[in-house]
């Protein structure tokens, strides 16, 4: 039998005197509780009504979210110890550290002085809260927290990196320690199958670092940029400034190398691709595509051809060519333009050729170990782009497109390698996400299908369903922004759109993810207003990177 309710217990819907008088309670919620309810409603992000100009300003300002917390809201008070430990334990959040700091400061000020809270928290502060939620950091990366080691190092590979650093001994370049620390902290965010190169990465990184000043400055700029994006410390703004300085220095050094005929084209290509890599993570749209075009001419120079056989291109020395190939394929998709190189590979018929044995992603072959997309799908994506811009009839395009779709659906991928069954399942899921993204790209580029097409909606739902099995913001989820974006482009229901937009943002803290989310908002508004499907490309200058 339940114990009688205490007469001193506060009612859920009213104060005690109101309950005794059996009258409807008109008691007002305390301001602190009302504030918390208002903030808690934003746990599931909803679109913020920003004008296009305001949204563009927000996404293009790299440092604006570093000053979200108003100066008069100091983080003090009795609630300090209650909120931050949970924030530090959470590896992924929609708020980010800055937003949580604002919430904590609100709580502490409310506790000290309820009557004055409205003076401190007004429309401007709530607007900043919305900005923090949409454009601020979404992933809190704490690699040194042993309680979350499975998230930061699911393949338990970091001890091997530490061992290789110890075996190689001190480097002649003391500043290389910054790069070593970068790999120790962010390796699982930087390479998809990072365990496949654990025993080689430090040795190869040292060689690359010592090759040229441009490579040295480019590698350091990326290492510092990752710290600025993920550490969520008071050093965020200085780190970002330092990353910009290193990048600017690398750009100047690269120009000197490009003008120097004694520098090997291979070294020049490595320098350009290091800057392409930095531009990608920094969200530098104009310089990203400019450097990619520079790399295209260098690739043609070192290969003596404009054709790349991605499935058979192998060797440590081909790393920058393979990196270029992936960026070029993604650039063709994002901009709806032909690729800068031609991708010709023989793809065995899946109905005849069955994969036998273990064919894991290999660090000296293909791009799957870097980005997570199976190599055969990367070639088929390039083939789709080539067909899109081919001078053939619509009927011929449709016929060839159906053959590409058959290969996409029937292709067998290499076996995944992972230490745990959970991680193996996650990487199998990632392969299937790329498969459905390739199908949707065919519908967009070749078949010109509408959103309500049954095949389109089936792939959208499959991507949402499979994504629901992956932990947000960590490997392999952090490599899947392109499948999420493509599925979001075709999504019709508000629920599906919200889910996929959130998945894009939750992949990480990089600015290019904010660009993708903003592009989805604009595409949805445009298609809803026009009543039909629009293209995601065609903007000059470009608005996002794949």
Region locations from a protein language model:
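Aromatic-lined, polymer-binding surfaces characteristic
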Residues: 275
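Intrinsically disordered, low-complexity activation-like regions
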Residues: 2-267, 281-483, 487-546
């Amino acid at each position: 039998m339940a114990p009688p309710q205490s007469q001193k217990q506060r009612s859920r819907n009213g104060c005690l005197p109101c309950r005794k008088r059996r009258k409807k309670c008109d008691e007002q919620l305390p301001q602190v509780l009302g504030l918390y309810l208002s903030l808690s409603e934003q746990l599931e992000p909803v679109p913020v009504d920003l004008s296009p100009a305001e949204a563009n300003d927000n996404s293009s300002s790299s440092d604006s979210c570093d000053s979200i917390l108003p100066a008069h809201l100091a983080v003090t008070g009795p609630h300090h110890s209650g909120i931050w430990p949970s924030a530090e334990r959470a590896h992924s959040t929609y708020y980010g550290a800055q937003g949580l700091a604002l919430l904590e400061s609100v709580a502490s000020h409310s506790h000290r002085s309820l009557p004055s809270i409205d003076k401190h928290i007004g429309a401007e502060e709530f607007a900043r809260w919305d900005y923090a939620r949409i454009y601020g950091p979404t992933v809190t990366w704490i690699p040194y927290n042993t309680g979350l080691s499975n998230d930061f190092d699911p393949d338990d590979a970091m001890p091997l990196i530490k061992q290789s650093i110890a075996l190689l001994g001190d480097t002649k370049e003391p500043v290389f320690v910054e790069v070593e620390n970068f790999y120790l902290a962010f390796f699982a965010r930087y390479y998809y199958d990072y365990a496949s190169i654990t025993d080689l990465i430090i040795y190869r990184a040292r060689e690359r670092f010592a090759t040229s000043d441009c490579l040295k400055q480019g590698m350091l700029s990326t290492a510092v940029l990752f710290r600025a994006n993920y550490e969520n410390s008071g050093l965020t703004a200085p780190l970002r400034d330092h990353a910009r300085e290193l990048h600017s220095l690398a750009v100047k050094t690269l120009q000197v190398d490009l003008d120097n005929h004694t520098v090997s084209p291979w070294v020049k290509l490595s320098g350009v691709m290091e800057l392409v890599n930095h531009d990608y993570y920094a969200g530098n749209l104009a310089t990203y595509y400019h450097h990619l075009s520079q790399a295209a001419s260098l690739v043609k120079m070192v290969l003596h051809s404009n054709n790349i056989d991605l499935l058979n291109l192998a060797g440590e020395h081909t790393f920058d060519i393979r990196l270029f190939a992936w960026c070029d394929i993604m650039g063709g998709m994002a901009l709806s333009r032909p690729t800068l190189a031609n991708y010709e590979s023989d793809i065995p018929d899946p109905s005849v050729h069955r994969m036998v044995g273990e064919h894991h992603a290999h660090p000296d072959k293909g791009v799957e170990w870097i980005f997570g997309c199976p190599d055969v799908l990367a070639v088929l994506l390039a083939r789709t782009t080539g067909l899109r811009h081919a001078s053939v009839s619509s009927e011929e395009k449709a016929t060839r497109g159906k053959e590409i779709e058959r290969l996409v659906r029937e292709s067998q991928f290499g076996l995944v390698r992972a230490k745990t069954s959970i991680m193996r399942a996650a990487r199998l899921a990632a392969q299937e996400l790329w498969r459905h993204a390739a199908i949707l790209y065919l519908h967009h580029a070749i078949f010109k299908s509408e959103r309500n097409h049954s095949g389109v909606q089936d792939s959208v739902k499959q991507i949402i369903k499979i994504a629901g099995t992956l932990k947000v913001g960590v490997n392999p989820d952090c490599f899947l922004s392109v499948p999420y974006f493509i599925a979001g482009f075709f999504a019709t229901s508000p629920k599906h759109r919200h889910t996929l937009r959130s998945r894009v943002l939750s992949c990480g803290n990089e600015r290019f993810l904010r660009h993708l989310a903003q592009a989805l908002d604009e595409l949805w508004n445009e298609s809803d207003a026009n009543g039909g499907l629009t293209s995601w490309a065609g903007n000059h200058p470009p608005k996002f990177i794949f």
